[in-house]
Every structure is written in structure tokens, then in C-alpha cells.
Amino acid sequence: MTVSPTDRMISSAYSATIRGRQDIDIYPQVGGMLTKVSVTEGQRVKSGQTLFIIDQVPYEAALQTAVANVESAKASLATAQLTYDSKEELYKENVVSAFDLSTAKNSLLAAKAQLAQAKAQEVSARNNLSYTVVKSPADGVVGTLPYRVGALVSSSIPEPLTTVSGNSDMY
């Protein structure tokens, strides 16, 4: 037997996971039934691209109610302003008491506060409606999609709707 030098390649196999530097778990900010899944597993997405749509009907109704409440509060404020102005003139002519004037002023202040509250509720309703469209926060690749159309989701679901992995920088 002769021994001679030869070139050999030694290979080793290791299990590993390649991940993007940034993995973003996607959770909904509002609850409801998934009405549309706009992506597939492994699809590349851009920042701001729609991933999911949650049932918008209850949120649209809440917005309409909030808008109506703002209009109602505006009307109440206008009435309270007229009442106060009227009482103020009558008070100057000693027709009504200081108590009546103070009551009208307090009603005016309450109407202003109700309008501010109604406007805040409208902003909240608009935000909630916008949250029904779940968008990608960054460029990347969509991970697994454990939820399908018809699934009931909320901000407290145990598993994210998906994960968007930024794969421009891997490790």
C-alpha cells in the first residue's frame, strides 16, 4: 500500500436560521374580524403597504355617531350662547338675578366642554377606523400567516398577525 498526498474537501453541516436584523411582529391596534389578507407568506412588502383589513363597519358607525355628536354639541353651544347673551342683557336692566346669569354662564361653559369632548371622541373614532387597515411599518418579507379571513383578532391575540422581516441586513 502506498500513501500519497491528495486534496480532500471536508464538509460539515450545521443547522442555522438566517434572520433579518429587524423582525417586526404585526399586531392589530383594534379588534374585529379579518375581512381581507392582502399578502402571502414570503412576499416582499414596502413600508406603508396594506397587509390586512379588519371589519370596518362598526368603526364607520362609531365615526358617524361621533360626527353627529359634534354637530349636536355645536347646536347646544349655540343655544347656550344665545341664552347667556340674553340673560346678560336682562341682568344689565335688572330684569333677572345674578343667579340666573351665573346659571346661564355655567350652561355655556358646560356646552363648550361637551363640544370639546365630542371633538375628542371624533378624533378617536377616526383613529380607530384608520387602524382597521393594518400596514407594514417597514420594507421586508412577510413571515407566516397564522390567521385567515374570518378570524377574530384583537390587540391582545397571543400570536402576531405576521412578522415583517427586514432582510436588507442579515445575520
Each language-model region and where it sits:
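Active-site-adjacent helical/loop segments in soluble small-molecule enzymes
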Residues: 16
